[in-house]
Amino acid sequence: MSAKKSASKATVTVQQIGSPLRREPSQRQTLIGLGLNKMRRTKTLEDTPAVRGMINKVAHLVRVVDEA
């Protein structure tokens, strides 16, 4: 039997709280990959292991606002 995936996917909302100035280029690219490029911007993303890894990499620059 095949298992059906639920229609609603888990999401996570992140807000940028730190500046990418004077940071490593890889951290800047990670912020861009998350869709964050300016202070206080928020973005709702699909909660996947890849996104969680990106959030962990720049945890000092972002804040998790909501997990749904």
UniProtKB/Swiss-Prot annotation:
One Pfam short name: Ribosomal_L30
Region of interest (Disordered), ranges: 1-26
Compositionally biased residues, Polar residues: 8-18
GO biological process: translation
UniProt keyword list: Ribonucleoprotein, Ribosomal protein
Family that this chain belongs to: Belongs to the universal ribosomal protein uL30 family.
NCBIfam families tied to this protein: rpmD_bact
PANTHER family in alphabetical order: LARGE RIBOSOMAL SUBUNIT PROTEIN UL30M (PTHR15892:SF2), MITOCHONDRIAL RIBOSOMAL PROTEIN L30 (PTHR15892)
Subunit structure as annotated in this protein's UniProt entry: Part of the 50S ribosomal subunit.
The name this protein goes by in its record: Large ribosomal subunit protein uL30
Species name: Parvibaculum lavamentivorans (strain DS-1 / DSM 13023 / NCIMB 13966)
Gene name per UniProt: rpmD
